[in-house]
């Protein structure tokens, strides 16, 4: 599975921890930036990710900002993107199973590293159910 990761300055530290953690697990996360804690604009980071997802350069992505809110709003303004803030195990599973989310979002200043890893592991290993009702609803999102 080809996975991208990106963060603004508020999520930079968490992004670096995740890259290191998953590298040790044999899971490669392609870093789309930012590359420092210097202030940057989360919409630009989100758009870099959404462009790559829509071009099918990656199967899924991780976006991180301080709260997860701003970067998720920016990503979800793009047709074809379904970015979900993951905050518990059930949400991590259902957002893939029912919504076929293609980007997991986290609040780097709001969530613990252990929780982020737990939720992303569920997200990345859960398949979309492909049930008609879910396909229909996803189709309605992109009208």
Task: Give the ranges of each region predicted by the language model.
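Short, structured active-site "lid" loops
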Residues: 45-63, 67
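Glycine-rich phosphate/diphosphate-binding loop of Rossmann-like nucleotide-binding domains
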Residues: 5-23
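Short coil/turn connectors at secondary-structure junctions
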Residues: 1, 57-59, 80-81, 99-101
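A short beta-strand-loop structural module common to alpha/beta enzyme folds
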Residues: 28-39
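Compact, glycine-rich, soluble single-domain proteins
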Residues: 56, 64-81
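Short hydrophobic/aromatic-enriched beta-strand-loop microsegments
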Residues: 81-88
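C-terminal binding/interaction regions
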Residues: 4-6, 10-11, 89-143
